[in-house]
Design a protein with these regions (language model features):
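Generic alpha-helix signal with a bias toward terminal, lower-confidence helices
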Residues: 27-29, 94, 196
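Residue-level signal for well-ordered alpha-helical segments
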Residues: 59, 71, 75, 95, ...
């Protein structure tokens, strides 16, 4: 079956990346066609499939959301370095990131999930801290998704295509266009945006911590 939403799959009880599935305490990588078999079931993850090898611009979000099972850094050492560099602020980020892994449970109970607002002087390391925390899930591009320049449909897509994960919206300012400010109003309550599709109102959910 096709895996359209990455991250936590509550029905199948596994965590999906674009290059494989983590289940039963181990990582199952995709084959050359993007197929991965877990137990008796097979799943299709198209981002790195040979079928799409010539599609350089497609699956741009999914291709950053991949797992490196050979990583040598332990979670303990990773968190220790964040706290060493960022102190108490780093501790808050770690706590929030761990909560994001269980976002569906928290949101299901309280009907909201807190946003993490990293603020400070220019050059103080806000974006790098966000990138560090997000590296638990992503191999990030050099430039994170911009509040001002990334199109609203793309922001909505990215916010709803990984469950129980983290998503960075970079460079928030108070002079953003009203349509973009409206996105932030909905994030707390779990809605990225609404649209009409074939005359039917569709709500795009937020499935990750922001």
């Amino acid at each position: 079956s096709l895996i359209e939403i990455l991250g936590w799959n509550s029905e199948e009880r596994f965590y999906a990346f674009s290059n494989g599935i983590y289940a039963n305490g181990r990582f199952y990588p995709t084959d050359d066609l993007g197929v991965v078999t877990v137990g008796r079931k097979s799943y299709y993850l198209p981002a790195f499939s040979a079928i799409h090898k010539d599609n350089e611009h497609g699956y741009s979000f999914e291709r950053t959301y991949r797992c490196d099972p050979q990583g040598a850094t332990t979670l303990r050492d990773f968190f220790a370095q964040i706290v060493k560099v960022y102190g108490t602020g780093g501790m808050v980020c770690i706590a929030w990131a761990l909560a994001a892994i269980f976002r569906d449970i928290i949101f299901g109970r309280f009907k909201y999930f807190p946003m993490l607002n990293l603020f400070g002087r220019k050059g103080s390391g806000k974006t790098e801290l966000a990138r560090a925390i997000s590296s638990m899930f992503f191999v990030l591009p050099s430039t994170p998704c911009s509040c001002a320049n990334t199109s609203i449909p793309v922001i909505g897509y990215n916010l709803s295509h990984a469950r129980n994960s983290i998503f960075i919206l970079d460079e928030f300012t108070n002079d953003l266009m009203p349509q973009r400010i409206d996105i932030f109003k909905g994030l707390w309550g779990g809605t990225a945006r609404s649209k009409m599709e074939d005359g039917i109102p569709i709500t795009i959910p937020v499935t990750s911590g922001v």
